[in-house]
Amino acid sequence: MIDSAFYFDLASPLAYLAAEQVLAGLGGPAAWQPILASRLPTAEPFGAAARQDVQRRAEQLGLQPVRWPAGFPFDSELAMRVATYAREIGRAVPFAQAAFRQAFAGGHDLSDPDFVLIAAAACEMHPRAVLAAAQRESIREQLRAATAAAIEAGVRAVPAIRVADSVFEGERAIEDARAALTAAAAVTRS
């Protein structure tokens, strides 16, 4: 198997667009890794021009129009702790998909625990277990460690896809990541 990961933060509309493309057939990566974008070296504010670009890109990808959460940008730490728990129990992809869609297709603020729980319920995660896990120090530490490891691997922004030692950042880098995965798979087969 090719060593690869998709790094995301549920507060990132660009990660939402990238996640939809990864789900639509990137052919990998093997691991979906939640990290805190606010701790990355290049965390930047998201202005009006960037919102318009996201709207245009969503349309190009055939997604419904983006509905911006009223509190955007929202504090994603609770949602990211739940994403870390979801990864721990093998539900990272369905939880991330449901949460991204809650935020950017539904226009819901993921700093509100109710919307995080709706996303969790959509992928069969029990609300009491989710709330308990989100408060565990071990989950907080896993998220901090994953963010630090991503930075160490060269991730400076989300979304990012790592294929072996190469990191591809930004929603529009999906094609570069796809080519790297294809090349790595060809080398693995030979």
Predicted regions and their residues:
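Structural alpha/beta surface segment adjacent to cysteine/selenocysteine redox centers
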Residues: 10-103
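C-terminal cap of thioredoxin/glutaredoxin-like
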Residues: 4-6, 10-28, 101-190
